[in-house]
């Protein structure tokens, strides 16, 4: 019985670490693809985002989801895609029930100061999450 508890703890930690790595890779992917737009590319994110659309609400989120389709599977819920476009990911630090474990939500919204605010939020436990946001101009 002790071995089962230790094994379950090990696999849970491995799943959390996998989700943290995926979260980081999604952020790096988005930032590097937006830089390509700034350098004059017309389409990025495997052809899923027209650079001229990067300031339109939810376009970056939808393009990111399409780019990662079938590539990152949720280690906690194996039948679910792991990268999902969402309008307001994990608001106020609360993980949405459907994505409590392993879901990476990506959104972008227009800002009053120009540009678009990109948000990447990932839950890897009941209340534990990673969150990063930045403005693309």
Segments predicted by a language model, with ranges:
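Amphipathic alpha-helical segments typified by the pilin-like N-terminal helix
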Residues: 1-25
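Generic detector of bulky aromatic hydrophobic side chains
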Residues: 10-11, 15, 29, 40-42, ...
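N-terminal alpha-helical signal peptides/signal-anchor transmembrane segments
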Residues: 22-41
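Periplasmic/extracellular, small/polar-rich flexible segments of pilin-like filament-forming proteins
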Residues: 35-137
């Amino acid at each position: 019985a002790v071995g089962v508890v230790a094994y379950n703890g090990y696999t849970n930690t491995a799943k959390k670490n996998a989700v943290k790595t995926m979260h980081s890779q999604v952020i790096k992917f988005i930032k590097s693809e937006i830089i390509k737009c700034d350098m004059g590319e017309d389409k990025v994110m495997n052809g899923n985002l027209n650079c001229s659309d990067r300031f339109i609400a939810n376009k970056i989120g939808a393009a990111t989801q399409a780019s990662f389709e079938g590539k990152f599977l949720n280690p906690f819920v194996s039948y679910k895609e792991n990268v999902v476009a969402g309008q307001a990911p994990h608001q106020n630090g609360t993980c949405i029930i459907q994505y409590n474990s392993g879901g990476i939500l990506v959104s972008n919204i227009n800002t009053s100061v120009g540009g678009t605010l990109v948000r990447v939020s990932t839950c890897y436990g009941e209340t534990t999450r990673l969150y990063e946001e930045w403005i693309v101009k």
